């Protein structure tokens, strides 16, 4: 029997492990090559359609549909290049002299340092052109290149003229923002007007003309400006891009961990578990709760058979027949709980893969996280005060309200059953007694620290509705 197992291992398992080890040793080379191919694809688009220049989405040469096609290809290639570069850096970080010796023994030849440096230099040259692209999408609407450049200039000596120009610029941005979104969060406007400035007194900010007149003049200038329509279109396109990227990223955060859990459980964890388990020593019950449930089910089945045997008009069953039915039911219950125990063990490892995929997605999607934050800011701060107060009350009542302990108890018991752990009542009660309190404190701190400063009317509405 051991000889047969050794032959099976050498014929089937060992080649798989060897190929997996060779794949692991080739990770740096493979990652760099894929990143290099992605950079070559971007370069090909530039040479073929943009005369070797950077892909310009504001170009009037192509239609919007064509530019959307180029933008989709560029985003995909940039994502591939960045992901593979990250994989290359991590694999190089884990690589050492022993890995290189093992690679040479396995017949793997790594490229020379000169080739690696040339490829990295080419990749950096291509990607560096588009580093700011993701941040432009996440940047507040209305922020133009002119505003970025003027922040480094020295202010003029006439404070009235400075305030007039600044108010006109702010009014133009505010008007453009109000056209494509009802309300914008105050903190998105403040960094453009107050960043890197020392606080000034009222005497320093007072000009020759009242601010209302300057605001009216600025609004008239915006209405007469022929470029205002183009600004509105550009801001609307940026808002549309933010919405698409945010919704897609939210779906990825949900779908990727779920798919990883199911695929890893079916393709990786289950075959390994089924290969190494032993049927004769396999444990039926992982905890005492499973055993109690199985015995209770078998006891109810036995009592039901005896009850039906007493009230039935048919000839009564013999003790041997009753024993046979009970034995068949016991084997059925054992198979059922054996499957539940195995499934619980598989869930532990599949959840580890799922959490790893979720963390990996967060690490490689930092620009998308910035866009998502901007999207949530526009959505949340665009709500009315009553809607904000309603959402706050809904979340606080669900998670930290009077009936929330029952929900937390169901969640913790379901999680314990998912992993095959016994439901520890002491831990559950301790968790319910502490975690909702901490969560309630965080809610209150956020409301009175941030929301009270940003939207005092929403806090007042929340207090009235809560009372």
From Swiss-Prot:
Residue spans crossing the bilayer: 249-269, 352-372, 391-411, 427-447
Annotated localization: Cell inner membrane
Membrane topology value: Multi-pass membrane protein
Biased composition (Basic and acidic residues): 191-203
Region: Disordered, residue numbers: 183-205
Gene Ontology CC entries for this record: plasma membrane
Family from the record: Belongs to the CemA family.
Protein task: Required for H(+) efflux immediately after light irradiation to form a rapid H(+) concentration gradient across the thylakoid membranes. Together with PxcL, contributes to transient H(+) uptake following dark to light transition.
Name used for this protein in its record: Proton extrusion protein PxcA
Organism: Trichormus variabilis (strain ATCC 29413 / PCC 7937) (Anabaena variabilis)
């Amino acid at each position: 029997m051991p000889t047969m197992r050794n032959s099976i291992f050498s014929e089937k398992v060992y080649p798989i492990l060897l190929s997996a080890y060779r794949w692991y040793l080739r990770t740096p080379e493979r990652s760099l090559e894929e990143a290099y191919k992605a950079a070559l694809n971007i370069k090909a688009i530039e040479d073929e359609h943009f005369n070797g220049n950077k892909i310009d989405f504001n170009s009037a040469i192509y239609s919007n549909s064509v530019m959307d096609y180029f933008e989709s290809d560029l985003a995909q290639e940039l994502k591939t290049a960045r992901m593979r570069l990250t994989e290359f850096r991590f694999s190089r970080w884990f690589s050492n002299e022993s890995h290189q010796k093992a690679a040479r023994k396995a017949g793997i030849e790594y490229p020379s340092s000169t080739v690696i440096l040339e490829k990295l230099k080419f990749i950096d040259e291509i990607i560096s052109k588009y580093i700011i692209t993701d941040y432009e999408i996440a940047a507040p609407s209305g922020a133009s290149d002119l505003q970025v450049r003027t922040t480094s200039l020295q202010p003029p000596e006439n404070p009235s003229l400075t305030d007039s120009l600044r108010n006109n610029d702010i009014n133009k941005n505010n008007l453009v923002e109000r056209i494509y979104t009802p309300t914008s969060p105050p903190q998105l406007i403040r960094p453009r007007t107050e960043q890197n400035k020392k606080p000034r007194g009222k005497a320093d900010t007072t000009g020759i003309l009242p601010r209302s007149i300057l605001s009216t003049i600025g609004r008239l200038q915006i209405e007469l400006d022929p470029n205002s329509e183009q600004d509105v279109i550009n801001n609307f396109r940026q808002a549309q891009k933010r919405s698409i990227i945010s919704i897609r990223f939210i779906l990825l955060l949900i779908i990727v961990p779920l798919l990883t859990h199911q695929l890893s459980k079916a393709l990786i964890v289950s075959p390994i578990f089924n290969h190494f388990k032993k049927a004769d020593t396999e444990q039926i019950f992982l905890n005492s709760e499973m055993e109690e449930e199985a015995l209770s089910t078998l006891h109810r089945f036995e009592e039901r058979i005896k009850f039906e045997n007493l009230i039935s008009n048919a000839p009564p069953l013999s003790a041997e027949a009753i024993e046979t039915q009970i034995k068949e039911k016991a084997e059925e219950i054992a198979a059922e709980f054996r499957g539940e125990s195995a499934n619980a063990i598989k869930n532990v490892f599949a959840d580890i893969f799922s959490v790893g995929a979720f963390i990996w997605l967060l690490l490689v999607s930092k620009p998308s996280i910035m866009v998502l934050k901007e999207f949530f800011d526009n959505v949340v701060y665009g709500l009315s005060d009553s809607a904000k107060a309603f959402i706050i009350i809904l979340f606080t009542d669900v998670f930290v309200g009077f009936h929330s302990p029952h929900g937390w108890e169901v969640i913790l018991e379901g999680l314990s059953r998912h992993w095959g752990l016994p439901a520890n009542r002491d831990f559950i009660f301790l968790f319910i007694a502490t975690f909702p309190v901490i969560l309630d404190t965080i809610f209150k701190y956020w409301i009175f620290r941030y929301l009270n400063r940003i939207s005092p009317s929403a806090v007042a509405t929340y207090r009235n509705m809560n009372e």
